[in-house]
């Protein structure tokens, strides 16, 4: 079966590099499924899991925004942050989720609501991928 070369890179360096049969990402415009031979595309990404399929198995990588560049035989994801399920510290992600929920419940003038909502989305994404 044909494959795509997939690279997921953050400012801290590479996170993932493999040949994959299919990649699914959540772009700002909606879900994007990428197979070998896909037309060239560039799209901004939402906070979500990237699904990588190979040999009937699916791997997940938690991505916190960024962009995806698609070429017929190569996909590059430039992410603000990215972690494979093995790299995620579940306790730390759970603590981040609790902190964000507390901030949102307080709703005091010094709490940045948008920032707290983004922190909650990132924590939930990390916990979903870690499972």
From Swiss-Prot:
Signal peptide: none annotated. It is a peripheral membrane protein. InterPro entries: ATP_F1_dsu/esu_C_sf, ATP_synth_F1_dsu/esu, ATP_synth_F1_dsu/esu_N, ATP_synth_F1_esu_C, ATPsynth_dsu/esu_N. Its main location: membrane. One of its GO terms (cellular component) is plasma membrane. It comes from the Bacteria. One of its GO terms (molecular function) is proton-transporting ATP synthase activity, rotational mechanism. It is found in: Cell membrane. Transmembrane segments: none annotated. The keyword Transmembrane helix does not apply. Keywords: ATP synthesis, Cell membrane, CF(1), Hydrogen ion transport, Ion transport, Membrane, Transport. The keyword Transport applies. Belongs to the ATPase epsilon chain family. Produces ATP from ADP in the presence of a proton gradient across the membrane. F-type ATPases have 2 components, CF(1) - the catalytic core - and CF(0) - the membrane proton channel. CF(1) has five subunits: alpha(3), beta(3), gamma(1), delta(1), epsilon(1). CF(0) has three main subunits: a, b and c. This is ATP synthase epsilon chain. It comes from Bacillus licheniformis (strain ATCC 14580 / DSM 13 / JCM 2505 / CCUG 7422 / NBRC 12200 / NCIMB 9375 / NCTC 10341 / NRRL NRS-1264 / Gibson 46).
């Amino acid at each position: 079966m044909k494959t795509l070369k997939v690279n997921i890179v953050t400012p801290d360096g590479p996170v993932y590099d493999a040949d994959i049969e299919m990649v699914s990402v959540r772009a700002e415009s909606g879900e994007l499924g990428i197979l070998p031979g896909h037309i060239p595309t560039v799209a901004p990404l939402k906070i979500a899991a990237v699904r990588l399929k190979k040999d009937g198995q699916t791997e997940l990588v938690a991505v916190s925004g960024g962009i995806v560049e698609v070429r017929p035989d190569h996909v590059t994801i430039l992410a603000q942050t990215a972690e494979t399920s093995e790299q995620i510290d579940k306790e730390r992600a759970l603590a981040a989720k609790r902190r964000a929920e507390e901030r949102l419940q307080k709703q005091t003038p010094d709490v940045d609501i948008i920032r707290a909502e983004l922190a909650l989305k990132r924590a939930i994404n990390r916990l979903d991928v870690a499972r």
